[in-house]
Curated annotation (Swiss-Prot):
<dbReference type="InterPro" id="IPR000651">
    <property type="entry name" value="Ras-like_Gua-exchang_fac_N"/>
</dbReference>
<feature type="compositionally biased region" description="Low complexity">
    <location>
        <begin position="741"/>
        <end position="758"/>
    </location>
</feature>
<dbReference type="Pfam" id="PF00617">
    <property type="entry name" value="RasGEF"/>
</dbReference>
<dbReference type="InterPro" id="IPR023578">
    <property type="entry name" value="Ras_GEF_dom_sf"/>
</dbReference>
<feature type="modified residue" description="Phosphoserine">
    <location>
        <position position="13"/>
    </location>
</feature>
<feature type="compositionally biased region" description="Gly residues">
    <location>
        <begin position="31"/>
        <end position="42"/>
    </location>
</feature>
<dbReference type="GO" id="GO:0005085">
    <property type="term" value="F:guanyl-nucleotide exchange factor activity"/>
</dbReference>
<feature type="domain" description="Ras-GEF">
    <location>
        <begin position="244"/>
        <end position="516"/>
    </location>
</feature>
<dbReference type="InterPro" id="IPR029071">
    <property type="entry name" value="Ubiquitin-like_domsf"/>
</dbReference>
<dbReference type="Pfam" id="PF00788">
    <property type="entry name" value="RA"/>
</dbReference>
<dbReference type="Pfam" id="PF00618">
    <property type="entry name" value="RasGEF_N"/>
</dbReference>
<dbReference type="InterPro" id="IPR001895">
    <property type="entry name" value="RASGEF_cat_dom"/>
</dbReference>
<feature type="domain" description="N-terminal Ras-GEF">
    <location>
        <begin position="89"/>
        <end position="213"/>
    </location>
</feature>
<dbReference type="InterPro" id="IPR036964">
    <property type="entry name" value="RASGEF_cat_dom_sf"/>
</dbReference>
<comment type="function">
    <text>Probable guanine nucleotide exchange factor. Putative effector of Ras and/or Rap. Associates with the GTP-bound form of Rap 1A and H-Ras in vitro.</text>
</comment>
<dbReference type="InterPro" id="IPR000159">
    <property type="entry name" value="RA_dom"/>
</dbReference>
<dbReference type="GO" id="GO:0007264">
    <property type="term" value="P:small GTPase-mediated signal transduction"/>
</dbReference>
Length: 780
């Protein structure tokens, strides 16, 4: 052992001056870590430099029907006086006949010299042979060694047992009923040679045969779940507005993750997937077909909902079309963009691309009027999502993003701005890639490289490249197991009930919605002046009689409102009223006023029980027209909202209604309530959802459950959206106790029951209230 001072001076010595006789590892805190340099570390670095500088020789060798690539490295010793060691060589099988590949597979030297051969061979063998044929060649090889020395036979049987065990564990789908004959042959060989029982190699062989028997025996096929059951009624695609975007994204992710976990990577090979449409190949790649079908299902749901059409068959006339206006279609576009954004946060790239590709498809992309009504924020998000899946540089952006998501997955989940919801539990940290990228890579690999060389040998270098792609899929499948999502029966039933349109049907409906040549290019958005109503009394005080009206599309001059005429006012009110959501259009579309022109005075009716704002209420209204910035005006414009509207409130809400079902207990149903829904229609929908007769809706009353065990009874003629209290979204549907119960009141609060909410802040302004009634009577 050298003294410590000499060991520390070793690094400063000239090269070759001192020969290291021994060393000891140092603690990192003493300078042996990254900040310092220990003796052992210096030797390792110098050895690495020597390896990098070592000359490399590469050549091919042919042996027994196989071509090997030999790589030789000549390393120089650290001591120039030491003898030169022999070169280090490694062999990799590059090509060969099928029999030569099987011999190399069962060679005991392969596992140490060519570590990637066995997994690559097992994953890609279906591209050049079948499983029964391969098992037959394995049996042939073992039977050929039966007359060889016992140690060689035992060594080969041990390798074969290890290979078959790995094969069964990593690719169980390869062992079906078609391999039963070859399995019987292997079992009889092991029994004949005495390796089917006992310990050691015999015990492993016996366990292997037992496991193979269990797998090969007839059992129920593991088929993907049907996307639509025969008895399911067709769903309305526009009902997507009923569901929250994050909840819908979670359910799409749940379905995509389940399919991706059941994906068989070897079925993605270009030689299999690329020939799927050939006659007699319809049974190939079932797991890939299921994933692609789900992708097309999501894309079809986007197209059907935006077009407002449901398919009843494949014929051109078997389509039910719901009449929608461009602003309503814009709400549907924005909804799907939000769903895609939520899927992006969940790292579900499959559904993100399904939604984006559907919105980029010709039937949707050509709807200029609808896109012109979409908000700027939605268009900005959509543009960023399109950039992710740009085809530039072979989807380089999506590939890099997927790689980053996998690396940063734990930190991304912990720092996510989306907190887990109690209803669905923790989201987890899984990843669902877009499978089309990998399918394209494998198809291109299959087309770019030959399956066989000029001499007829199987090109195994091609299979190694394919195996690299399949290994990436395997790794992503392990990452996909990190999700923790729960199914939502309502959303999944809606997804199952969707009937997507065919390509021809989509194009025809799109041309009916906007005939070619009738849609002008969307004009650039123009920032319009904003009107601020500081006090409600200013509006009513500026009205001197039933005819003078307030102009809502011009800014205030000197703090006073400029009066307008009745006809322009109705037109401007029609422009600034928020368009109804599609889901508010119940089954009776023909009777809904919003299906007609909103500029028609006969269809502008005030809500039945709209609470009046207080004196100090302030409200801003965006004054854009429907064709230029109208969507922003709709989302930020003047609205009346009942029950204490807050930031982000809109013209629809989702409430939970509990209905007592006698001995069956009680259930909750989620109902979408819009600004046009009155109590009878809401009660009827609740009864229908609970499989009750909606004709007896008059026998029930709707009660809002408020904090503090209070109740708010909704009158039969009231508009539920405006009458409800914003403090709670829980309701109770019960049989009417007293027919006279028609007064809005808080049953548990004496102070609240004294003054109905309809008196609001106007109880001290009787003249203003009377004037307001006159205005409403004159206008409507």
């Amino acid at each position: 052992m050298l003294p410590r001072p000499l060991r520390l001076l070793w690094d400063a010595s000239p090269p070759g001056g001192v020969v290291l006789s021994s060393f000891r590892s140092r603690d990192p805190e003493e300078g042996g870590g990254p900040g310092g340099r220990g003796v052992g570390g210096g030797q390792e670095e110098e050895e690495e430099e020597e390896e990098d500088e070592a000359p490399v020789s590469v050549w091919d060798e042919e042996e027994d029907g196989a071509t090997f690539t030999v790589t030789s490295r000549q390393y120089r010793p650290l001591d120039p006086l030491a003898p030169t060691p022999p070169p280090r060589s490694s062999r990799r099988l590059r090509a060969g006949t099928l029999e030569a590949l099987v011999r190399h597979l069962l060679d005991a030297r392969t596992s140490g010299a060519d570590v990637t051969f066995t997994p690559a061979f097992l994953a890609t063998h279906r591209a050049f042979t079948s499983t029964p044929a391969l098992l037959g060649l394995v049996a042939d090889r073992l039977e050929a060694l039966e007359s060889h020395p016992t140690d060689e036979l035992e060594r080969t049987i041990g390798v074969a047992t290890s290979v078959l065990s790995t094969w069964l564990a990593s690719h169980p789908e390869d062992f079906g009923s078609e391999v039963k004959g070859q399995l019987d042959r292997l079992e009889s060989f092991l029994l004949r040679t005495g390796y089917a029982a006992g310990e050691g190699v015999g015990g492993g062989s016996a366990d292997l045969i037992r496991n193979l028997r269990f797998r090969v025996d007839p059992q129920a096929p593991d088929l993907p779940k049907p996307l639509a059951l025969p008895g399911d009624p067709p769903a309305d695609p526009t009902d997507v507005l009923v569901f929250l975007a994050d909840h819908l994204a979670e359910q799409l992710t749940l379905l995509d993750a389940e399919l991706f976990l059941h994906l068989v990577p070897s079925q993605c090979l270009g030689s299999l997937w690329g020939h799927r449409d050939r006659p007699g190949h319809s049974h190939l790649c079932p797991s890939v077909r299921a994933t692609v079908t789900q992708f097309n299902k999501v894309a079809g749901a986007v197209v059907s909902s935006v077009l407002g059409a449901t398919s009843a068959g494949e014929g051109p006339g078997e389509v039910t079309i719901r009449p929608l206006r461009p602003p309503q279609r814009a709400r549907l576009l924005e909804k799907w963009i939000r769903v895609a954004e939520e899927c992006r946060l969940l790292r579900n790239f499959s559904s993100v691309y399904a939604v984006v590709s559907a919105l980029q498809s010709s039937p949707i992309h050509r709807l200029r009027a609808a896109w012109g009504e979409a908000t700027r924020d939605s268009l900005r998000v959509f543009s960023s999502l399109c950039q992710i899946f740009s085809e530039e540089d072979n989807y380089s952006q999506s590939r890099e993003l997927l790689l980053q998501e996998v690396k940063l997955q734990p930190s991304l989940e912990s720092n996510s701005k989306k907190a887990p919801r109690s209803g669905s539990g923790s989201r987890g940290g899984g990843v669902v890639p877009y499978l089309g990228t990998f399918l394209k890579d494998l198809v291109m690999l299959d087309a770019a490289s030959k399956d066989e060389l000029e001499n007829g040998y199987i090109n195994f270098d091609k299979r190694r490249k394919e195996f690299a792609v399949l290994s990436e899929l395997r790794r992503l499948q392990n990452e996909c197991r990190g999700y923790d999502l729960r199914p939502d029966p309502d959303i999944q039933q809606w997804l199952r009930g969707l009937r997507p349109l065919t390509e021809a049907q989509s194009h025809r409906v799109s041309c009916e919605v906007e005939p070619p040549g009738t849609s002008d290019p969307p004009a650039p958005r123009v920032l319009r002046p904003t009107l601020v109503v500081s006090q409600w009394t200013e509006v009513l005080g500026s009205v001197g009689g039933p005819t003078p009206l307030v102009s809502w599309d011009r800014p205030s001059v000197g703090g006073e409102e400029v009066p307008g005429t009745p006809a322009p006012l109705l037109t401007r009110l029609a422009q600034h009223m928020k368009w109804p959501s599609v889901s508010s259009l119940d089954s009776a579309l023909e009777s809904t006023p919003y299906l007609h022109s909103l500029a028609d005075p006969s269809h502008l009716s005030p809500p039945a029980s709209s609470p009046r704002p207080s004196r100090g209420h302030r409200r801003s209204a965006s004054c854009g027209s429907p064709l230029s910035g109208g969507a922003e005006g709709a989302s930020k414009g003047t609205e009346y909202r009942g029950g204490g509207s807050g930031p982000g409130a809109s013209d629809c809400r989702i409430i939970r209604v509990q209905m007592e079902l006698g001995e069956d207990g009680s259930v909750y149903k989620s109902i979408l309530v819009t600004s046009q829904d009155k109590a009878p229609s809401v009660i009827s929908r609740v009864l229908k959802k609970n499989n009750r007769d909606s004709a007896v809706a008059s026998e029930y009353e709707l009660v809002q459950l408020l904090p503090g065990e209070r109740e708010l009874t909704i009158p039969p003629s009231a508009n539920v959206f405006y009458a409800m209290d914003g403090a709670s979204h829980d309701f109770l549907l019960r049989q009417r106790r007293r027919p006279s119960t028609a007064t809005l009141g808080l049953t548990s609060s004496p102070s609240a029951s004294g003054t109905p909410p309809s008196e609001g802040g106007g109880g001290s302004f009787p003249r203003i209230k009377a004037t307001g009634r006159k205005i409403a009577r004159a206008l409507f």
